[in-house]
Every structure is written in C-alpha cells, then in structure tokens.
Amino acid sequence: FYFPEAILSYQTASHYDPEHPMPYWGLAHAMGPNPNSRYARMPDDPKGEGLKAINSALSRIQNATPIEAELIRALHVLYDKESISDDAKRDQAYLAAMRELNRRYPDHSDIAALYASAYMSIGRWDYWDSEGNPKAETMAVAEALEHIMATDLSNPGVLHLHIHLICLLYTSPSPRDWLQ
C-alpha cells in the first residue's frame, strides 16, 4: 500500500527477471487507480506508465501461470481506454473481472484482496446506503475477505482492506454483527 516503494520493488524485479510478466503487472497495479487516488479524484496514469507496464505484462503473458495470466488480463481492462473509454465503465469492468476471479478462486487471498480493492475504487468509501445498511457488494466483499481470514491471517492486503470495510461499521444499524 506504499506505492512508491512498490513501484521501486517491481522495477527491481523486472530488472532481475525481465521476461516474467508479473513485475510489469505489479508496476501497472501500483501506478494505476486505487481507492485513495479515486477518492482524491487524482488523474489515472497521467504519464502513461501504467499502460506501458500492463502492455509489457501482456507481451510476456506466455511466461505466466494460468492465474497470473488471468490477473494480467483483468488489470488490462482497467487501462484499456480503446475498448472502454469511460473511466467509470472501465472500473465496473475491472470489478466484474475481479469478482469472477474471486468466484473461481475463493481461497486465493491475493485475489480476494484485489477484488476488495476493485470494489473500493468504485465505492470511494461509500459502502453503505443512506439508512446505514451495507450495500449489496459491500457484504459480498466482506464475505470474501472474511472467508480468507477464517483460515489465513497472513495476507496484509486482506487485513488492511477488511479494516476499511469495518471502520465504517458505526454507520450500520447493527454494528455488533460486524464484530462477531
């Protein structure tokens, strides 16, 4: 979640393993939109470096595992302005791709975290309706994260994003439900 360090780490990884696609995927992920950048209305990929990185990952996709290839294709949707020019529609398409990956790989902690992040980028800290009830996808994301947490507490992304979901529990009509 510290993007400058993540970018430096992925750049270093791409130097040591230039033919593996995942360092480039990581660069694109770190350079791209995230819940905080969307909330602050920062421009997406203003210098085009994220697009360049995801295209580099795509050009090396033959070196990826099947799950890595699916993650690369999913993230490409977020950058593919030629196919979907509207930012909000691209966000929704990326969320749909991550929702599907989470459905297919419910025990994969990184996919659960990426699904949550995709949802939070769209929600921009708005996960509850005007009456304090969680929106439908808020519960689905919470359940995906909690499914992972039931057996594995080692993924910091899962834990971090779960905290963001429950930090707003005070607006819920039944906060005790979240504390169980």
Which positions does each model-derived feature cover?
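Active-site-surrounding "flap" and adjacent substrate/cofactor-binding loops of secreted or lumenal enzymes
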Residues: 25, 29-58
